[in-house]
């Protein structure tokens, strides 16, 4: 018999201790991984709801199971809010992740072996944009494009590659690029060779929703995103489009269900719905503006302290520190900062001499610290402490001093007040 008072702590203390340990880690560590954020208690309430019990294969009004009258309302709310927030006229809220959303787009629009132009993973792209170890690189003929010597997307290179290889699809979007993308220019290049323009805006979706970063939806044939990262919702994916016909949208829907997924996760879709509503609030815009300000403030400190930032700055929520000149590996920098309770991720930099398992850089993002309430002053202090650690990654006494400062500021700015 199920009872509402059942809990994990009493039944499975081994698991509960690990879960509580993660709560403490999040409260006592500064989170700078660009793809991570703190979701709201409302989203977590949705994800822990009885919606998790409901199977709902199909789409609202066209289900393969009975008893879907309430989950239809939930999914339709998420669809309508996604369309309103991003100016789309099509939305699919069922993908379990950004990678699943991307896989569905490939499946809908391409045949195995088709040529695709995607951003090189080593220069800022994503695994699903054609990395040889990913399904995208295994199933399709990938032609990578990259950045120029100034660290900016090389549109001339994209245009030349497109003209030469005649791709069926060009992918815009990134996982480690700190500049703005000219979506109109990307569409112009795609149109010149009759290719689809597919944009993966996962990293900057929250900034786009708030009008802080250019919106690709009016320019692309199809757009995907995650619902976490800057959007600060549950872990999941979305597919959006504007200006397509019903046949095009039917292809996209079919590629999600039944093409690549079965039943949707209705508890997660409820979390997406509430996160999309939160993203429509005026304070969400203020939050995203602060995300950009904090990233810029941190870049200023790193540059002043003699550190190299790829492309020399940032126009979004993230930036890459290039540590080649400092002769520090990304792996060692990541570990040293971790000992000071500062969490980053090692990341390859353009023309990186080291392997992807070691790297010569770290990726830094401001969404999570901004969610805690950090403003420019705190962001600058934090960047200074990071420089103190990186100036001598073997000075354990100094790392311990920085750790104490981190613990103090974390107590002052709790994740969940």
Swiss-Prot record:
Which residues bear the site annotation Plays an important role in substrate specificity?
228
Q: Which GO terms describe its cellular component?
A: cytosol
List cystine links. none
Which reactions appear under catalytic activity for this entry?
Answer: (6R)-5,10-methylene-5,6,7,8-tetrahydrofolate + glycine + H2O = (6S)-5,6,7,8-tetrahydrofolate + L-serine
Q: Which NCBIfam families match?
A: PRK00011.1
Q: How does it assemble?
A: Homodimer.
Name of protein? Serine hydroxymethyltransferase
> What's the encoding gene here?
glyA
Q: Which GO terms describe its molecular function?
A: glycine hydroxymethyltransferase activity; pyridoxal phosphate binding
- Role this protein plays: Catalyzes the reversible interconversion of serine and glycine with tetrahydrofolate (THF) serving as the one-carbon carrier. This reaction serves as the major source of one-carbon groups required for the biosynthesis of purines, thymidylate, methionine, and other important biomolecules. Also exhibits THF-independent aldolase activity toward beta-hydroxyamino acids, producing glycine and aldehydes, via a retro-aldol mechanism.
**Which family is this sequence assigned to?**
Belongs to the SHMT family.
List the keywords (alphabetical).
Amino-acid biosynthesis, Cytoplasm, One-carbon metabolism, Pyridoxal phosphate, Transferase
Write one Pfam family the protein is assigned to.
SHMT
**Which top EC class applies here?**
transferase
Per the UniProt record, the source organism is: Proteus mirabilis (strain HI4320)
Q: Where does (6S)-5,6,7,8-tetrahydrofolate bind?
A: 121, 125-127, 355-357
- Alphabetized Gene3D superfamilies for the sequence: Aspartate Aminotransferase, domain 1, Type I PLP-dependent aspartate aminotransferase-like (Major domain)
Localization (cell)? Cytoplasm
């Amino acid at each position: 018999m199920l009872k509402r008072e059942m809990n994990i702590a009493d039944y499975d203390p081994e698991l509960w201790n690990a879960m509580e340990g993660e709560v403490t880690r999040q409260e006592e560590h500064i989170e700078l991984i660009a793809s991570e954020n703190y979701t709201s208690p409302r989203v977590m309430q949705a994800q822990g709801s009885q919606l998790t019990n409901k199977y709902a294969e199909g789409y609202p009004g066209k289900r393969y199971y009975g008893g879907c009258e309430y989950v239809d309302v939930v999914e339709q709310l998420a669809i309508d809010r996604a369309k309103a927030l991003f100016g789309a006229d099509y939305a699919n809220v069922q993908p379990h992740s950004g990678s699943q959303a991307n896989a569905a787009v490939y499946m809908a629009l391409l045949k195995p072996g088709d040529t695709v132009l995607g951003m090189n993973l080593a220069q800022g792209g994503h695994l699903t944009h054609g990395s040889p170890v990913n399904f995208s690189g295994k199933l399709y003929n990938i032609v990578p494009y990259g950045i120029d010597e100034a660290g900016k997307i090389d549109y001339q290179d994209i245009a030349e590659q497109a003209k030469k290889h005649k791709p069926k699809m060009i992918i815009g979007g990134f996982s480690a690029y700190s500049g703005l993308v000219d979506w109109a220019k990307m569409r112009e290049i795609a149109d010149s060779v009759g290719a689809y323009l597919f944009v993966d805006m996962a990293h900057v979706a929250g900034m786009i929703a708030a009008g802080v970063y250019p919106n690709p939806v009016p320019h692309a044939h199809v757009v995907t995103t995650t619902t976490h990262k800057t959007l600060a919702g549950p872990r999941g994916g979305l597919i959006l489009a504007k200006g397509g016909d019903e046949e095009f949208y039917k292809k996209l829907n079919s590629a999600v269900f039944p093409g690549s997924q079965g039943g949707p996760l209705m508890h997660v879709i409820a979390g997406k719905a509430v996160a999309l509503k939160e993203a429509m609030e005026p304070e969400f815009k203020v939050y995203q503006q602060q995300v950009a300000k904090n990233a810029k403030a941190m870049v200023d400190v790193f540059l002043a302290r003699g550190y190299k930032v790829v492309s020399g700055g940032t126009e979004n929520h993230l930036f890459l520190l290039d540590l080649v000149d400092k002769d520090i590996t990304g792996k060692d920098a990541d570990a040293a900062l971790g000992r000071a309770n500062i969490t980053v991720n090692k990341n390859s930099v353009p023309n990186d001499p080291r392997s992807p398992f070691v790297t010569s850089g770290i990726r830094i993002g401001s969404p999570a610290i901004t969610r805690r309430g950090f403003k420019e002053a705190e962001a600058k202090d934090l960047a200074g402490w990071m420089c103190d650690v990186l100036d001598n990654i073997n000075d354990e006494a100094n790392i311990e001093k920085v750790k104490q400062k981190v613990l103090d500021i974390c107590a002052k700015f709790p994740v969940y007040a």
